[in-house]
């Protein structure tokens, strides 16, 4: 599953530019498997958060507030070693790895948006990677929590 922000990458990779600014589910079987690692709707919410970041927020992927928040979290090493659901339905937190949110500010925003938006039950893990829910996000990365409050509420 992927959000396609622009036509140029699609053209370069032999895909139809008509897919630009859309979320594409490449393979339903893969989506069905991947969704087990998130809470209800989490994987789709992740991709829709990319679309919101690109299309709605000021300066899109170059949004200064998100970039600054991401840079601060990376400098502090907040996401260098976090729990991840790596076993699907059982949702066991037995693995610790560098978070996918470390990839770039786009993944940081999408990953944390899932934790923030998916639900407010502090006993449910909505995200694949730590922080798993809004309550955990508030204590794990309070700066990001405040930013997401401004963006989403």
Residue ranges: model-predicted function:
Residues 4, 9-12, 19, 26, ...:
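Metalloprotease/metallohydrolase-associated module, dominated by Zn2+-dependent proteases
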Residues 1-75:
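Acidic/His-rich structured neighborhood in mature extracellular/periplasmic domains
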């Amino acid at each position: 599953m992927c959000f396609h922000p622009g036509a140029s990458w699609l053209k370069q990779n032999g895909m139809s530019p008509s897919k630009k600014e859309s979320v594409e589910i490449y393979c339903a079987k893969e989506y069905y498997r991947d969704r087990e690692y998130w809470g209800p709707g989490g994987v789709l919410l992740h991709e829709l958060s990319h679309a919101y970041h690109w299309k709605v927020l000021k300066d899109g992927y170059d949004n200064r507030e998100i970039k600054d928040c991401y840079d601060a979290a990376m400098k502090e090493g907040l996401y260098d070693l976090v729990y991840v659901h790596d076993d699907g339905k059982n949702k066991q937190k037995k693995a610790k790895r560098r978070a996918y949110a470390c990839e770039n500010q786009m993944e940081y925003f999408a990953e944390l948006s899932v934790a923030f938006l998916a639900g407010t039950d502090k006993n449910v893990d909505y995200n694949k990677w730590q922080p798993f829910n809004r309550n955990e996000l508030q204590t794990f990365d309070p700066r990001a929590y405040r930013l997401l409050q401004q963006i989403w509420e």
